[in-house]
Regions:
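Positively charged n-region of N-terminal signal peptides that target proteins for export
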Residues: 1-6
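Glycan-processing catalytic domains of CAZymes
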Residues: 26-406
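Bacterial N-terminal signal peptides
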Residues: 7-18
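Boundary at the C-terminal end of the N-terminal hydrophobic targeting segment
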Residues: 20-24
């Protein structure tokens, strides 16, 4: 915490540092009516050796999906996948996901990507499933480094503190390894997502990222090294994206004291959000989807006026993290994953939110023609596009209908 405080205390000097990167009025396809649809993808639905060592042989997050139960009146659980409990590390299963995504208008899978001081985690999703799928070139992909603490919430007991399993903070040496790895292994893939030729790479937890280096200047220098390595590999630049929020969710997350000064001062090229609830409090057990949408739009307006770099808006499918709770514990709004939920998140209301988001983007000539969606498969957080036995392909059909390409 001392190091973090020292980083934040230096932010007063950040305004003196020139901001690099793509300005809002230079963003990709700013005059197009076609919007690039990016879907986050959470890859914990396969067998991972670390998970099995901790949680038992054969464990994946599907176990939490299967074991979920209704926790209050009108609560629809468990969620049942229409395709069954697929193995995303199997290229055939991943090919099914790719075909479905492309058919319904998803252009990019933005994978939650994990790498800690002792190496990669959950990497089989991309390395074995996606990159070996026979149709992988139909869709683009990119990485969001999910550099948050990995804590024990699989499931979480109400009165037991979440044990820290893998710290999100890494050494500067580890970050250098990460830079080399992603450039060589992922950026050079022909279907890696690029903006104006620059590979897109997003960082999820900015306070944790700053802790890695101990000072603002050292953090900025690390980013510059990453950028220079990317250029040395033959790319015109790196498109570095920052995720930020005003409301921490997972234990260990923190907010930025001055996000604009930090994000722009460090030289990020764009900024975005991961999920609506990072900006909107869920004040009721069943908080209405349309109300959350409207509150998020207020945040979007604030972000657009505060940042001089492009803000990429988010559309969330829903929120219900109750499957990650110990099902025999009483349920209430006591802290993640014991949280209030989003209700009324029907495919029809999701479609309306998409249309409103599209209209807001197209009404702003400076806005990048990009939106992201949470999420392809956050089943245990109640925010997923994949078909289930209740709504079928409804959320995907909403994307297809609203985001028709010319």
């Amino acid at each position: 915490m001392t190091r973090l405080c020292s980083v934040l205390s230096l932010l007063a000097f950040a305004s003196l540092i020139g901001v690099s990167g793509v300005r809002a009025d230079d963003a990709k396809d700013a005059t197009s009516d076609d919007i690039e649809v990016v879907s986050y993808y959470f890859g914990n639905y396969h067998l991972d050796k670390r998970n099995e060592e901790r949680l038992g042989k054969g464990w994946s997050e599907w176990e939490l999906v299967k074991n979920a139960r209704p926790r209050f009146e009108g609560h629809q659980q468990p969620k049942v996948p229409l395709w069954g409990y697929t193995d995303e590390a199997n290229p055939r299963d991943m090919a099914q996901k790719i075909d479905c995504a492309v058919k319904h208008g998803v252009d990019v899978f933005l994978f939650d990507w994990y790498y800690y001081d002792d190496g990669p985690f959950l990497e089989r999703t991309i390395d074995e499933g996606f990159l070996n799928a026979e149709n992988r070139d139909k869709i683009k992909f990119a990485l969001m480094w999910a550099n948050h603490d990995w804590v024990e919430i699989f499931p979480k007991h109400k009165d037991v503190p979440s044990a820290l399993i893998y710290p999100g903070k890494v050494t500067p040496e580890t970050f250098d390894k990460i830079c080399d790895l992603v450039i060589e292994k992922y950026f050079k893939q022909p279907n890696y997502w690029k903006i104006d030729g620059a590979p897109y790479f997003s960082i999820y937890e900015l306070t944790k990222f700053a802790e890695n280096f101990g000072s603002f200047d050292a953090t900025k220098a690390a980013i510059e090294r990453f950028r220079e390595k990317t250029k040395a590999a033959g790319f015109p630049d790196l498109h570095l994206n920052a995720v930020y929020w005003g409301r921490p969710n997972i234990p260990g997350e923190a907010t930025l004291t001055d996000p604009v000064k930090m994000i722009e001062g460090l030289g990020f090229d764009s900024v975005t959000s991961y999920v609506w609830i990072h900006h909107v409090p869920l004040n009721e057990l069943k908080t209405d989807f349309n109300w959350v949408r409207d509150e998020y739009f207020k945040h979007w307006d604030s972000a657009r006026s505060s940042f001089s770099i492009p803000y990429i808006p988010n559309v969330s499918v829903g929120w219900d993290s109750s499957p990650r709770t110990f099902q025999d514990d009483p349920f209430g709004n006591w802290g993640y994953p014991f949280t209030n939920t989003i209700s009324n998140n029907t495919p029809e209301n999701f479609k309306t939110a998409l249309q409103m988001t599209k209209d807001r983007i197209l009404s702003d000539p400076k806005a990048p023609r990009i939106l992201n969606i949470n999420c392809w498969n956050e089943w245990t957080e109640g925010s997923y596009l994949e078909p289930d036995t209740v709504n079928g392909y409804g959320y995907l059909e909403a994307i297809r209908d609203v985001m028709k390409k010319k």
